[in-house]
């Protein structure tokens, strides 16, 4: 049996532009994609922290070092410039693979520059954010 598991995320990125008339997808700085182990064309879930919207789309590589997080096409009705978003990927794994897998969590600043890369999906590196109550640290699970 395979399980769908959390693979990686880019945490609390800022939308740099939203283009309603582009043909779908999300454009992401190539540095961020590589840091989060996300390929161009890969399926991502995007959660908008600002307004609660959630959607799925695919990635397009943006200019390296640009900090671009561009919401394209119909998704621009839901997510707007300066919204805070989380881009999440999942992967199919066997139970054994899932137990051994270490996810990638890329924390960024307001300019979408990497501030830390970790592997704990519940760890916050943004001022004012805390670990959710009762959430175990990854090391406590081993």
Curated annotation (Swiss-Prot):
It is found in: Cytoplasm. Its main location: cytoplasm. It comes from Arthrobacter sp. (strain FB24). The gene is panD. Heterooctamer of four alpha and four beta subunits. Catalyzes the pyruvoyl-dependent decarboxylation of aspartate to produce beta-alanine. Pathway: Cofactor biosynthesis; (R)-pantothenate biosynthesis; beta-alanine from L-aspartate: step 1/1. Is synthesized initially as an inactive proenzyme, which is activated by self-cleavage at a specific serine bond to produce a beta-subunit with a hydroxyl group at its C-terminus and an alpha-subunit with a pyruvoyl group at its N-terminus. It holds the Pfam family Asp_decarbox. HAMAP family: PanD. The modification Pyruvic acid (Ser) is found at residue 25. GO terms for biological process: alanine biosynthetic process; pantothenate biosynthetic process. This is Aspartate 1-decarboxylase. The keyword Lyase applies. Its cofactor is pyruvate. The active site is at residues 25, 58. It is an enzyme of class 4 (lyase). Belongs to the PanD family. Keywords: Autocatalytic cleavage, Cytoplasm, Decarboxylase, Lyase, Pantothenate biosynthesis, Pyruvate, Schiff base, Zymogen. One of its GO terms (molecular function) is aspartate 1-decarboxylase activity. Binds 1 pyruvoyl group covalently per subunit. It comes from the Bacteria. GO terms for cellular component: cytosol.
């Amino acid at each position: 049996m395979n399980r769908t598991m959390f693979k990686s995320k880019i945490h609390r990125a800022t939308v740099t532009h939203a283009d309603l008339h582009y043909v779908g997808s999300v454009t992401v700085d190539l540095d961020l994609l590589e840091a989060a182990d996300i390929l161009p064309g890969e399926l991502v879930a995007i959660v908008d922290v600002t307004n609660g919207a959630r959607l799925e789309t695919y990635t397009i590589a943006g200019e390296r070092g640009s900090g671009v997080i561009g919401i394209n096409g119909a998704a621009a009705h839901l997510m707007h410039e300066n919204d805070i978003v989380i881009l999440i990927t999942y992967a199919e794994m066997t139970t054994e693979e899932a137990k051994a897998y270490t996810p990638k969590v890329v924390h960024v600043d307001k300019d979408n520059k990497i501030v830390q890369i970790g592997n704990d999906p519940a760890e916050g590196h943004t001022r004012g954010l805390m670990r959710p109550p009762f959430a175990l640290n990854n090391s406590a699970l081993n």
